[in-house]
Amino acid sequence: MNDRQAALDQALKQIEKQFGKGSIMKLGEHSDQNISTISSGSLALDIALGVGGYPRGRIIEVYGPESSGKTTVALHAIAEVQAQGGTAAFIDAEHALDPAYAKNLGVNIDELLLSQPDTGEQALEIAEALVRSGAVDMLVIDSVAALVPRAEIEGEMGDAHVGLQARLMSQALRKLSGAINKSKTIAIFINQIREKVGVMFGNPEITPGGRALKFYSTVRLEVRRAEQLKQGTDVMGNKTKIKVVKNKVAPPFRIAEVDIMYGEGISREGELVDMAAEVDVINKSGSWYSYKEERIGQGRENAKQYLKEHTDIRDEISQRVREEYEIDGANKEPLEETEETLSLLDDE
């Protein structure tokens, strides 16, 4: 062993002695090279994300115009976490969560942890406490724009508070990012959009809360309504495009198209018909859809209805589509507490 290697080994021992075992290691020795994920609750979005769902221990930003389906996307993820036996928390800074709608989407509202804080500082302190407990698998904050700093709440109408919210978010994310990674919590920040005044060229849209969230996010999703879904003259929902604007774990810029039905959320059958037809699991000939030589409906809506009524066939098609896209759940880890996550509070 040469002098350089001996010096390095001595330094590594000193670091581990001072900061604990596992504080530094060779990347090849890291036991968690595969990215562990939790399904988003949408097959199309799982495929667009490239790794089969939201990566655990990472920050996700979901933004878009008003009533585009941002909260719906987050609630589907919560339902998926709860279905796997995990714990989810919802920090409702907007004070606008509809429990009945959440229940329709599959959320177990009896088990969902809910907080409706008065100030941005309170919301982020609650978020930090939940993350550092190591017992929360998913945390949703709705929304960043509603995280109003205490100084603004206590001040007068019309007072200028330049950059307060951006500083608040920057400080909070510096504290949260490490704990989120260690605890394997998925932190979903819902955000709104604003428009810069006087922008003549380029996109005038920006998201509130400064630049910190853009940098700390592993995945950024842009949610926008594409068109209305009608039955006769009645509007039943919206076709929505979810664009993966940023992705640190897979190629970005993929787009998931989903049907968000009023009162029901994302239509599993709608996205399944589209994705299955794309990889020839379902055959589309003219207006007819067929599966294993058997016709399942004339027109997309009839095919959706057939799958809704025949859940065994729907699940079989879903599994085949996941295998075609190679997201059959190989990177799913059980949601359970670990010694590392439970010791987060002791590290402080």
UniProtKB/Swiss-Prot annotation:
Residues 336-348 have a biased composition (Acidic residues). Residues 325-348 are annotated as: Disordered. Residues 325-335 have a biased composition (Basic and acidic residues). Gene3D superfamilies: P-loop containing nucleotide triphosphate hydrolases (3.40.50.300). ATP binds at residues 64-71. GO terms for cellular component: cytosol. Keywords: ATP-binding, Cytoplasm, DNA damage, DNA recombination, DNA repair, DNA-binding, Nucleotide-binding, SOS response. One of its GO terms (biological process) is SOS response. Pfam families: RecA (PF00154), RecA_C (PF21096). One of its GO terms (molecular function) is damaged DNA binding. InterPro entries: AAA+_ATPase, DNA_recomb/repair_RecA, DNA_recomb/repair_RecA_CS, P-loop_NTPase, RecA-like_C, RecA-like_N, RecA_ATP-bd, RecA_C_sf. Signal peptide: none annotated. It comes from the Bacteria. It is found in: Cytoplasm. Belongs to the RecA family. HAMAP family: RecA (MF_00268). Can catalyze the hydrolysis of ATP in the presence of single-stranded DNA, the ATP-dependent uptake of single-stranded DNA by duplex DNA, and the ATP-dependent hybridization of homologous single-stranded DNAs. It interacts with LexA causing its activation and leading to its autocatalytic cleavage. This is Protein RecA. The lineage of its organism: Bacteria, Bacillati, Bacillota, Bacilli, Bacillales. The gene is recA.
